UniProtKB/Swiss-Prot annotation:
Function statement: Component of the ubiquinol-cytochrome c reductase complex (complex III or cytochrome b-c1 complex) that is part of the mitochondrial respiratory chain. The b-c1 complex mediates electron transfer from ubiquinol to cytochrome c. Contributes to the generation of a proton gradient across the mitochondrial membrane that is then used for ATP synthesis.
Residue positions binding heme b b566: 97, 196
Organism: Cheirogaleus crossleyi
Family under the similarity heading: Belongs to the cytochrome b family.
Binding-site positions, a ubiquinone: 201
GO CC, any one term: respiratory chain complex III
The name this protein goes by in its record: Cytochrome b
Length: 379
């Protein structure tokens, strides 16, 4: 008798995706982050659902409803901090996942890569709107500053900003719609994840060598299910250490002050995972130029496949490209640090230099070095 998992219409899909899926035999732990992102998404949806049961999306009660969750709801504090720090874990895994794709040349699978970029934008939008919901000082002013950037768009900018606000400033209408979008977008993300996996399973996974692994496949279960569970264990340990020992480590103290439109915080800054893009935005003196640079800092991922000049897919055997990849990583760390600093000397200059280096590395230096490596292959 045939196994039910191979005949049942629903279980057949699960079986071909997670059990009998042929996977390359040599994929390393850098390939764990896809499943970790799935786990993060599940944690965020579950904790978010429980938070939404007690949260009120109204400017007069939003802040106190979050306080109520932490003080009065059974285990409310743990749900709230799991959600807040879960977002940090989500972005940590996202950045590593994208970096892995760049390092090993996974961007050659264009549909999977492009859906991934759409996913990145959607997750960033969701996280931004979620940060506004507690209605603290940084929530309010962060929302004001970031939405105001759209006013830099010629002709329609001002109308667009007021349309998003639902009035002439960030107010009750803005909070209500941000809550609605923050609630619905994770389900949109889940749908996009399914499309992402659909396209991935059309081509099969890449591997560290960047070569075809058709001749050497192993079943996903039990080999990679066990491997993913180990990764999940490490992720949960890190998340629990954050939640139980220093839940506010990655947050901003200003967000413990209720939103006050009459008093601006000394340094308006987003959560750590947006700081690199915020630093690029601030490094350009012109408003429209800054907004364009901000969008391009992420959208540049879409043109990486077009900039590929190398004859080898992976960076595994390209030492010069490896060095540049880690220079780019260090540059992103510098941008993240600069984004959290005040706008004054020497931070302005460092931010501008790091921004120029970021775009130069991806657009000019890395493709040029790849061409040099092609020449060196002939020696």
């Amino acid at each position: 008798m045939t196994n039910i998992r191979k005949t049942h219409p629903l279980m057949k899909i699960m079986n071909s995706s997670f059990i009998d899926l042929p996977a390359p035999s040599n994929i390393s732990s850098w390939w764990n982050f896809g499943s970790l992102l799935g786990a993060c998404l599940a944690i965020q949806i579950i904790t978010g659902l429980f938070l939404a049961m007690h949260y009120t999306a109204d400017t007069t009660t939003a802040f106190s409803s979050v306080t109520h969750i932490c003080r009065d709801v059974n285990h409310g504090w743990i749900i709230r901090y799991l959600h807040a720090n879960g977002a940090s874990m989500f972005f940590l895994c996202l950045f590593i996942h994208v970096g892995r794709g760049m390092y090993y040349g996974s961007f050659t699978m264009s549909e999977t890569w492009n859906i991934g970029i759409i996913l990145l934008f959607t997750v960033m939008a969701t996280a931004f709107m979620g940060y506004v919901l507690p209605w603290g000082q940084m929530s309010f002013w962060g929302a004001t500053v970031i939405t105001n950037l759209l006013s830099a768009i010629p002709y329609i900018g001002t109308i667009l900003v007021e349309w998003i606000w639902g009035g002439f400033s960030v107010d009750k209408a803005t909070l209500t719609r941000f809550f609605a979008f923050h609630f619905i977008l994770p389900f949109v993300i889940t749908a996009l994840v399914m499309v992402h996996l659909l396209f991935l399973h059309e081509t099969g996974s890449n591997n560290p060598l960047g070569t075809s692994s058709d001749s050497d496949k192993i079943p996903f279960h039990p080999y990679y299910t066990i491997k993913d569970l180990l990764g999940l264990l490490f992720l949960l340990i890190l998340l629990m250490v954050l939640v139980f020992f220093s839940p506010d480590l990655l947050g901003d103290p200003d967000n413990y002050t209720p939103a006050n439109p009459l008093s601006t915080p000394p340094h308006i800054k987003p959560e750590w995972y947006f700081l690199f893009a915020y630093a690029i935005l601030r490094s350009i003196p012109n408003k429209l130029g800054g907004v364009l640079a901000l969008v391009l800092s992420i959208l540049i991922l879409a043109i990486i496949p077009m900039l590929q000049t190398t004859k080898q897919r992976s960076m595994m055997f390209r030492p010069l490209s490896q060095i540049l990849f880690w220079v780019l990583t260090a540059d992103l760390f510098i941008l993240t640090w600069i984004g959290g600093q005040p706008v004054e000397h020497p931070f302005i200059t460092i931010g501008q230099m790091a921004s120029i280096l970021y775009f130069s590395l991806i657009l000019i230096i890395m493709p040029t070095v790849s061409l040099m490596e092609n020449k060196m292959l002939k020696w």
